[in-house]
Amino acid sequence: MQCPFCQHTDSRVLESRSAEAGQSVRRRRECLQCNRRFTTYERIEFVPITVIKRNQDRELFDRSKLLKGVATACEKTGLTALQLESLVDDVEAELQQQAVREVTSTELGESVLTKLQSLSEVAYVRFASVYRQFRGIRDFVEALDQLKESGDGPLPSVLDEPYEDTAQPTIMISPQ
């Protein structure tokens, strides 16, 4: 390791410890030429993953963008920030383990939906509504039917009954 002060290439390691939750190693070094101390970090180098969007544009995978989308879908669902971070960590780990360096936004979205399904039905439907570009109530009903068929969680029995509008029209007469 080259000394940042005198550019000498020999140094000795004084101390090593895990850093950043085990994602890197922090090393305290001493230059053998000038005897000054400096710190280095060793990190795992991940190969960048490219996301192919619907319009065929390509952009680098952005973990924070995915986390923001998931967090928006999970607002007021009771899921913790730690659960959301873990979900995004799992998706990112799956991407890194694949031999392919490009992934479609469809594959990415389906991976998120699979994980959300077991965490929160509400978050699942919210994320699906944006990701799958729901156009109307039928799209929501289809998503709810898929959840019901998967059997991963109880859905309200009200979905088993056809909707009937039993409200009577109200006529307001104002005095003149």
Curated annotation (Swiss-Prot):
Q: How is the cofactor bound?
A: Binds 1 zinc ion.
ATP-cone domain mapped to chain residues: 49-139
Q: Name one Pfam family in it.
A: Zn_ribbon_NrdR
Which UniProt keywords are listed?
Answer: ATP-binding, DNA-binding, Metal-binding, Nucleotide-binding, Repressor, Transcription, Transcription regulation, Zinc, Zinc-finger
UniProt record, GO biological process: negative regulation of DNA-templated transcription
Give the residue range of the signal peptide: none
Keyword hit for Zinc: yes
Which GO-annotated molecular functions does the record name? Answer: ATP binding; DNA binding; zinc ion binding
- Bias class Polar residues marks the residues at 167-176
- UniProt cofactor(s): Zn(2+)
Region annotation (Disordered) ranges: 151-176
Q: Does the keyword Nucleotide-binding apply?
A: yes
What's the stated role of this polypeptide?
Negatively regulates transcription of bacterial ribonucleotide reductase nrd genes and operons by binding to NrdR-boxes.
Q: Which family does it belong to?
A: Belongs to the NrdR family.
| HAMAP family with a match to the protein in the record | NrdR (MF_00440)
Name this polypeptide is given: Transcriptional repressor NrdR
